A protein has these predicted regions:
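Carbohydrate-active catalytic/glycan-binding domains of CAZyme proteins
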Residues: 1-198, 202-214
Length: 214
């Protein structure tokens, strides 16, 4: 977590204020149990910036199933009447200022929730990789190549969450899949909700687009 403390002095008397953001959404209870991790966390670094009158917390999420690969993120900060900070929920929106438009194409690497039935708060023990049981954001190419990221290891029970989208008027959802697989993706509006639609997929060693009604 990135946390904060306050004091009337620069060098003493600090009082712990709480969590500003957790890179696994720990302690957030607005959409899931407070202790349930919704991403694979490790350490966290960041800072607070005011942009056009709105305060933001910058932080990072982890990618590639290791503690050493990081994705820069930002969330708006809300304050209580007494000036204390309300913990920010992880989203896919960044500095957008509201829900993303539900039309068009978005990269999978903006997923703000990523987990499976093998629950883990941490990305991996230091120096180790998360094995093939766990979904992870990755990319093709070598270090420094500008390649679009995607989610690897979307196996049975793997869940990727994207928040928030304005999907008014949306009747179809498409995904692009590559891999030796057979099954389907379920489209939901909550991690434990009922499916709004199902997208069957099949084997392919190139990216294929699949579409379903919702």
């Amino acid at each position: 977590e990135l946390c904060y403390a306050t004091s009337k002095y620069p060098n003493k008397g600090f009082t712990y204020g709480g969590v500003i953001v957790s890179n696994c959404d720990l302690y957030i209870d607005s959409y899931k149990p407070a202790e349930k991790p919704m991403y694979y966390a490790w350490n966290n670094h960041g800072g607070i910036v005011e942009i056009n009158g709105q305060w933001y917390i910058f932080y990072h999420r982890h990618t590639n199933g290791t503690p050493f690969n990081r994705q820069a993120c930002a969330e708006p900060i809300r304050f209580r009447d007494d000036g204390s900070i309300i913990q920010a929920e992880m989203t896919s929106c960044g500095l957008n200022g509201g829900p993303l438009i539900g039309k068009g194409e978005y990269p999978a690497y903006i997923a703000c929730n990523l987990f499976c039935k093998h629950e883990s708060i941490y990305t991996a023990a230091e120096g180790l990789w998360m094995d093939a049981r766990f979904p992870k954001i990755t990319q093709d190419g070598k270090d420094g190549d500008e390649e679009a990221g995607y989610i690897l290891n979307m196996r049975d029970s793997a869940t990727a969450g994207f928040k928030y989208f304005d999907c008014r008027g949306i009747e179809k959802v498409s995904i692009k899949v590559r891999g030796y697989c057979s099954g389907h993706f379920e489209i939901k509006t909550s991690w434990d909700g009922e499916p709004l639609g199902t997208i069957p997929i099949g084997f392919s060693n190139i990216w294929q687009e699949y579409t379903a009604d919702i």
